[in-house]
Amino acid sequence: MTAHEVNFDGLVGLTHHYAGLSFGNEASTRHRFQVSNPLLAVKQGLLKMKALADAGFPQAVIPPHERPFIPALRQLGFSGNDEQILDKVARQAPRWLSRVSSASPMWVANAATVCPSADALDGKVHLTVANLNNKFHRSLEAPVTEALLRTIFRDESRFSLHSALPQVALLGDEGAANHNRLGGEYGLAGVQLFVYGREEGNEKRPARYPARQTREASEAVARLNQVNPQQVIFAQQNPEAIDQGVFHNDVIAVSNRQVLFCHEAAFARQERLINHLRTRVDGFMAIEVPADEVSVSDAVATYLFNSQLLSRDDGSMLLVLPQECQDHVGVWRYLNKLVAEDNPISAMQVFDLRESMANGGGPACLRLRVVLTEEEQRAVNPAVMMNDALFTALNAWAERFYRDRLTAADLADPLLLREGREALDVLTRLLDLGSVYPFQQTGAADG
């Protein structure tokens, strides 16, 4: 059956700021306390979406979350109306205000793990929401992510959506950022590669930075998504790579159809994994980048592997890269050599995503890949599909509501909270989402 990969990109939220909240993500730490530009950030993301949609790649959007998230502050013991709570937390515990104001939901590669209908025992598309429990600011995302995905994938006869795993360390799940699918045509059954950083009883784990994904979580997600057990492989990420800032597998590897593009130091027992994939995937091709051409640290700094690998109609592939790759002499030299060689990757497209990149999120972080048949794609909420009209509407929406300068101190501004809620009210109508946010369901306690 004919199927296509649809990229659902996250819209950057109004409170996009640099707070260094993500230990293990070196870009996040390095840019802490810099001044951000939320308007530029959302426009950079929209330009990438529109350019790829215009090039014939199906593209959709996933909305941002409500931030600052006042219910989390109430749960932490701050009381009063919303404005009083903002004032209290800004004076007493400003770090908590930054945590509940993170725009991290824009990195929707962490929203869920997806199983196409061709791989599922029941023939439905499955999505399991990620619990993201390694970081407090990201652990807040799952309930609203689930609500948003339910408004996008509404047809329960075609889509099965699963709530996040329990919020315990043993079941740490970071979503599609630690998941690859390999195979032939999108509509045919593929092999799903789940990548984890640690497992109970295995002493092989990173020493410096946390391994966010557990094997136990990956196995549970595969069960929830009803992936055919004959089509699943579990592999450990190289702990030494995690300690160099590879906090998700999509910072060191990307796959598309029969191609796995990765660093030679991406996986534990990598040679064995590659040989196993050769026996499981027809026409499998591993493009392993040697350390003497691109080091792990340079791969992390440029997000070479946090790229999108997209199939074109002629069977060749396009590599979508951040500007940082072109700016790095060694990485750009390697990439030009790569596209000149005999392999499916024949073209590159570079995007300026510096606002997201400074927080540690490249092109691949910003998108959730969902393989859909033509019938399944028609069952998706049509209002979220990118086209000329939506691009124009979202740019006008951003111009109306987004600030072009934001610091951590600005998060305490009650006007920012009101601006955000008004913006999301307008957006839910624009994208036909209904009352999906908590403030819309309970009413804002603004005194």
Swiss-Prot record:
Pathway: Amino-acid degradation; L-arginine degradation via AST pathway; L-glutamate and succinate from L-arginine: step 2/5. One of its GO terms (biological process) is arginine catabolic process to glutamate. Gene3D superfamilies: Succinylarginine dihydrolase. The keyword Hydrolase applies. Its EC number is 3.5.3.23. The active site is at residues 174, 248, 365. It is an enzyme of class 3 (hydrolase). It catalyses: N(2)-succinyl-L-arginine + 2 H2O + 2 H(+) = N(2)-succinyl-L-ornithine + 2 NH4(+) + CO2. Keywords: Arginine metabolism, Hydrolase. GO terms for molecular function: N-succinylarginine dihydrolase activity. Pfam families: AstB. Catalyzes the hydrolysis of N(2)-succinylarginine into N(2)-succinylornithine, ammonia and CO(2). Homodimer. HAMAP family: AstB. Belongs to the succinylarginine dihydrolase family. This is N-succinylarginine dihydrolase. It comes from Salmonella arizonae (strain ATCC BAA-731 / CDC346-86 / RSK2980). The gene is astB.
